[in-house]
Swiss-Prot record:
<keyword id="KW-0067">ATP-binding</keyword>
<keyword id="KW-0315">Glutamine amidotransferase</keyword>
<protein>
    <recommendedName>
        <fullName>Phosphoribosylformylglycinamidine synthase subunit PurQ</fullName>
        <ecNumber>6.3.5.3</ecNumber>
        <ecNumber>3.5.1.2</ecNumber>
    </recommendedName>
</protein>
<dbReference type="GO" id="GO:0005737">
    <property type="term" value="C:cytoplasm"/>
</dbReference>
<comment type="function">
    <text>Part of the phosphoribosylformylglycinamidine synthase complex involved in the purines biosynthetic pathway. Catalyzes the ATP-dependent conversion of formylglycinamide ribonucleotide (FGAR) and glutamine to yield formylglycinamidine ribonucleotide (FGAM) and glutamate. The FGAM synthase complex is composed of three subunits. PurQ produces an ammonia molecule by converting glutamine to glutamate. PurL transfers the ammonia molecule to FGAR to form FGAM in an ATP-dependent manner.</text>
</comment>
<keyword id="KW-0378">Hydrolase</keyword>
<feature type="active site">
    <location>
        <position position="208"/>
    </location>
</feature>
<feature type="active site" description="Nucleophile">
    <location>
        <position position="89"/>
    </location>
</feature>
<dbReference type="InterPro" id="IPR010075">
    <property type="entry name" value="PRibForGlyAmidine_synth_PurQ"/>
</dbReference>
<dbReference type="InterPro" id="IPR029062">
    <property type="entry name" value="Class_I_gatase-like"/>
</dbReference>
<feature type="domain" description="Glutamine amidotransferase type-1">
    <location>
        <begin position="5"/>
        <end position="234"/>
    </location>
</feature>
<comment type="subunit">
    <text>Part of the FGAM synthase complex composed of 1 PurL, 1 PurQ and 2 PurS subunits.</text>
</comment>
<dbReference type="GO" id="GO:0004642">
    <property type="term" value="F:phosphoribosylformylglycinamidine synthase activity"/>
</dbReference>
<keyword id="KW-0658">Purine biosynthesis</keyword>
<dbReference type="GO" id="GO:0006189">
    <property type="term" value="P:'de novo' IMP biosynthetic process"/>
</dbReference>
<dbReference type="GO" id="GO:0005524">
    <property type="term" value="F:ATP binding"/>
</dbReference>
<dbReference type="Pfam" id="PF13507">
    <property type="entry name" value="GATase_5"/>
</dbReference>
Amino acid sequence: MADVTVGIVVFPGSNCDHDTEYAVASFPGVKPVMLWHNDHDLKGCDAVILPGGFSYGDYLRCGAIARFSPIMREVIDFAGKGRPVLGICNGFQVLVECGLLEGALIRNAGRRFVSRQTTISVANNATIFTDRYQKGEVLRVPVAHGEGNYYASPETIESLESNGQVVFRYTDAWGNATAEANFNGSMNNIAGIVNKQGNVLGLMPHPERASEKLLGSEDGRRLFESLFAHLAGA
């Protein structure tokens, strides 16, 4: 794989930045670069990841303050040029707050923070983030959030579905999008979406926490592999 540089944005309150750094660095030829929230430069990165955590303490709303960070102006411009941006958990929340992705992430239906292993299925494998998966493949990936309930207008949901922008869904172990599997109440069991251009992905589950056998699952690793292979032209 050709050399690839991946920026990982660190906000005050981020707590998955080093987990993400570890997962990224495990790929030969891929170099993680930490980007501070006050930076005005993406340092020549080929892709940007917004990691999980509680940016700015989740005051006002999850991701509501982080969207105004200086670094986000650069990320928005970067995404506008068609460059890859990945938002994980709190990173997904930041992406919807700044308008790079549609919809909103609201309080879980059960009104509780949920931290556990979950199963999701690949709804669309024709993206730069998922082409190493099979469509319909079921993955074991952990979640840890209190506001991961994906919500959007009926028109937006219809558009996301018809355009193939729903990338991951909460399902049971057999790939069925049941009410029981939809622990946070997300519309249409949505766990992750991509923008119309296909270069910005947000998901609530944590692929970096499912990147090696020691963690109980390697199912998240191929998301990174898909992205890095795309960047390297492999």
